[in-house]
Amino acid sequence: DLDHLARLAVTVDAKVLLLSHMRGHICDMDLLMQICDGAGVKVVEDCAHTMGGAWNGVPSGRHGAMAAYSTQTYKHMNSGEGGILTSDDPDLMARAIVLSGSYMLYARHRAAPPPEAFEQIRWVTPNVSGRMDNLRAAILRPQLADLPRQVARWNALYHAVETGLRNTSGLRIIERPEQESIVGSSIQFRLPSFSEAQIAAVLKACAARGVDMKWFGGAEPVGFTSRYD
């Protein structure tokens, strides 16, 4: 709700917006950045579900000050655990490198900003030992090169399923904006007129046919869903 965000941006003393592109859906990033830039709010993008996607031709994660991409087991690239940070801001990347556990060996980092970016940061930044090891990096490199092919394959499957579901009675497809280049690694739809019992029956019937679906909104957290009371 970008109207709500615009109101909050001028009434709340926020410095950073952590934006999660949940389940691969990208909002109007042009308008969001206009709101946040106007209010002096830095944007950090959680691109765990949009790695390989884009908004208006700009890759997901390239709008904000920094982006995080997960490479956990169930993401678009799989190294078991871990992830990738990207930014054009040398201060942010210098801090990330020292935080990751570089000690004073930051100059060995092949993607590091110039040494002067570390001059002040190295004195005030703790070492939390969150670095990626070479084995995970080696596992990810061929997957990164293969990502465009994977995105095209997922999208073909996504659109086939979307076509099959469209016009199904009681089911509402999530329409995607023209500006959004999707990564169709998962698909969502709504059952707005169904009761909880009816939704549970749909899940059970689909599971019996080998189609495993997750219900976001159920009383009990299951699988990828979570709940915090």
How should these model regions be labeled?
Residues 1-79, 84-92:
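Active-site phosphate-binding strand-loop segment of PLP-dependent enzymes
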Residues 4, 31, 91, 149, ...:
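An acidic, carboxylate-rich microenvironment
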Residues 22, 144, 192-193:
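Conserved donor-binding loops in enzymes that form glycosidic bonds
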Residues 41, 170-171, 211-212:
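Short aromatic/hydrophobic-glycine micro-motifs
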Residues 50-56, 63-186, 223:
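Active-site region of PLP-dependent enzymes
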Residues 174-229:
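Conserved PLP-binding catalytic core of the aspartate aminotransferase-like
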